[in-house]
Amino acid sequence: MKVVILCGGKGTRLGFETKIIPKPMAKIDKEPIILHIINYYKKFGYNDFILALGYKGSIIKNYFKKNKNFLINVRCVNTGKNTLTGGRLLKLKKYLSKEKDFMLTYGDGLTNQNLNKLEKFHTKNNKVATMTIVRPPVRFGEVKMRGNLVNNFKEKPQIRDSWINGGFFVFNKNIFKFLSKENEMLEKEPLEKLSKKKQILGFKHLGFWQCMDTPRDKEYLIKLLKTKKAPWKTR
């Protein structure tokens, strides 16, 4: 099964770094986050990747051109600098024409979910789309007090009563019937239509999930890696 990774956004919230490189090339310790994502998919047997490039996409393309020892197949496709996520996927249609199903995720998120179970869940239920849903981590640590004593502290706890889109999708080929133009976000009209037609399922993941939106997020991921507490690490 092919894996699409959306790599075209500008990632402005990450700060000055993304004025020089695209967000998926921002390093978590010694490796860009895009490689952490790919290595995690490899752990579950997925080796065929399509990278939807946009902003500073040539940097990503050159990285994989120079590093051919990853034992994977990587196709880099320029989907436009300002194209939105739905349009990026639409521009990949010809590269996915022979696929009954394919996976898709964002180039800035990490998890420790079982991707094989995600695929089996999608296949069993036979819907157009399966979306991983996660509990959103709060931005600040949670403190529990007993009098003036800090009784418990948890860095980035999960919010317990809501779910959000965590990426790590599985789509079947009928998703392209819901995409019509390049200036639309996958997460808006297409997924809203799928929801109304009862053609999208949520795969609940209660384990680790973290996107890298801000410098604070990046530092948190680096901290996990350096303290050998990175749940996504495969080696």
Language-model regions, residue ranges each:
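N-terminal nucleotide-binding beta1-loop-alpha1 segment
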Residues: M1-K19
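Residue-level signal for inorganic ion chemistry
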Residues: I34, I60, L92, D108, ...
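Catalytic-core segments of class I nucleotidyltransferases/pyrophosphorylases
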Residues: F102-M103, L110, N116-T123, P136-V138, ...
